[in-house]
Amino acid sequence: MSRYDLVERLNGTFRQIEQHLAALTDNLQQHSLLIARIFSLPQVTKEAEHAPLDTIEVTQHLGKEAEALALRHYRHLFIQQQSENRSSKAAVRLPGVLCYQVDNATQLDLENQIQRINQLKTTFEQMVTVESGLPSAARFEWVHRHLPGLITLNAYRTLTLINNPATIRFGWANKHIIKNLSRDEVLSQLKKSLASPRSVPPWTREQWQFKLEREYQDIAALPQQARLKIKRPVKVQPIARIWYKGQQKQVQHACPTPIIALINTDNGAGVPDIGGLENYDADNIQHRFKPQAQPLRLIIPRLHLYVAD
């Protein structure tokens, strides 16, 4: 497929996402809102976009005010729709839930509508990340040449739909991206970097090359069977825990965007019990279960690369 055809499909798919999101928000407003509970988080400024989040103050919104915030959030796709001071790199998150009363027919209609939106979002992401054939660093410029100001993460994010929950509880998740590597795999990566000299601020090209050589020597000095692990922290994420009484099971969802809960009164479902979201405080985290951590020694800080002792 030619690059021109891909751009045509990219623009066409995005227009469909916008149209279907507009239709969905109109459709939802035609349904009876049983309960809405949304939690807005502080705006991340451009100056603080890389700063660690040690505390997050939550503001609760209820009823029609919460619904209006959520429906606007679903269609928040461009930086032009937000304050100039807000970071365009830090993801805008709005945890919470909207609960609508449905019958069998309207439930199926909304399920199909949301499924179609999520299919389009997945297709759009596939075009950008795979079909474009571009490395991650070049994708930003390519996408924004054709869709100026697009917040790609908001375009990728699918909508979470649940049916007839009994209880909904919100919380925070601290996670790490973990990847196990062999010594030879790390050496191969460093060798590629050494073969393509460049400057990385605040280092000059020569300083960066020297830094890479030191890192290569440190890894090469390890035993061949050394166990290496990338353990990169991810910013704390809001989550929702859903309990289904009939199935006697709990399901956990990431909750960067308000969940849509359909309550089918034809089947005798009732309004769920919805909890709040507490302020986040990194110094006051309570772990339900924290397994014994494997002893690790940091060996390349910039890569978050550790070696198991």
Curated annotation (Swiss-Prot):
SUPFAM superfamilies referenced in this protein's UniProt entry, alphabetically: Replication terminator protein (Tus)
InterPro entries: DNA_replication_term_site-bd, Tus_dom1, Tus_sf
Pfam families documented for this protein: Ter
Keywords from the UniProt entry: Cytoplasm, DNA replication, DNA-binding
Primary location recorded for the protein, binned into one broad class: cytoplasm
GO biological process: DNA replication termination
Cited Gene3D superfamilies: 3.30.54.10, Replication terminator Tus, domain 1 superfamily/Replication terminator Tus
Compartmental location: Cytoplasm
GO cellular component, one term: cytoplasm
MF annotations from Gene Ontology: DNA binding
Family note: Belongs to the Tus family.
Function text: Trans-acting protein required for termination of DNA replication. Binds to DNA replication terminator sequences (terA to terF) to prevent the passage of replication forks. The termination efficiency will be affected by the affinity of this protein for the terminator sequence.
Protein's UniProt name: DNA replication terminus site-binding protein
